[in-house]
């Protein structure tokens, strides 16, 4: 990759900017910002401020295509892929592409065979949490 990176002196993880590195360093120091409403902790003040909108209901970022509103610009950018058809996450195994990283990561389990969700009653394992929930109804 041609992009310059900076690495964490503590663990070696690489980042594309010093700003991201500085946020990451808080993992090692334990410095966090906590929500006064629910106690959830964040590594950056901006992530806390975005989270606080879930309590206030504020959604200042709106989609110019459909008018749907969001708590952060990052979520809006991801949402816009619905309208553009952009699918930036491609599977190296089968070529299938995805709009959302989370869906792509779930898809990868098909190829790895990973089944991280197990039934506490019978031990049967599932690839997806939703499949475990459906299965749990039989017990």
UniProtKB/Swiss-Prot annotation:
Q: What is this protein called?
A: Gastrula zinc finger protein XlCGF67.1
Main localisation, per the record? nucleus
- GO CC, one annotated term: nucleus
Q: Which GO terms describe its molecular function?
A: DNA-binding transcription factor activity, RNA polymerase II-specific; RNA polymerase II cis-regulatory region sequence-specific DNA binding; zinc ion binding
Q: Does the keyword Repeat apply?
A: yes
What SUPFAM superfamilies is this protein classified in?
A: beta-beta-alpha zinc fingers
Answer whether the UniProt record assigns the keyword Metal-binding to this protein: yes
**Species per Swiss-Prot/TrEMBL record:** Xenopus laevis (African clawed frog)
Recite the UniProt keywords alphabetically.
Answer: DNA-binding, Metal-binding, Nucleus, Repeat, Transcription, Transcription regulation, Zinc, Zinc-finger
Similarity-based family? Belongs to the krueppel C2H2-type zinc-finger protein family.
Instruction: Give the function comment from the record.
Output: May be involved in transcriptional regulation.
According to its UniProt record, where is this protein located? Nucleus
Identify the domain of life: Eukaryota
What ranges of residues constitute the C2H2-type zinc fingers? 6-28, 33-55, 61-83, 89-111, 117-139
Q: Where are the transmembrane segments?
A: none
């Amino acid at each position: 990759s041609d992009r310059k990176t900076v690495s964490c002196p503590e663990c070696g993880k690489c980042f594309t900017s010093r700003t991201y590195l500085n946020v990451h360093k808080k993992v090692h120091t334990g410095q966090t910002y906590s929500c006064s409403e629910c106690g959830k902790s964040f590594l950056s003040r901006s992530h806390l401020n975005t989270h606080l909108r879930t309590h206030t209901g504020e959604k200042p970022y709106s989609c110019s295509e459909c008018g749907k509103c969001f708590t952060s610009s990052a979520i809006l950018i991801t949402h816009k892929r619905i309208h553009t058809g952009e699918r930036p996450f491609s599977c190296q195994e089968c070529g299938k592409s995805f709009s959302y990283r989370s869906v792509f990561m779930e898809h990868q389990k098909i190829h790895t065979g990973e089944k991280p969700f197990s039934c506490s009653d019978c031990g049967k394992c599932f690839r997806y949490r939703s499949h475990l929930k459906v299965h749990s109804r039989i017990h």
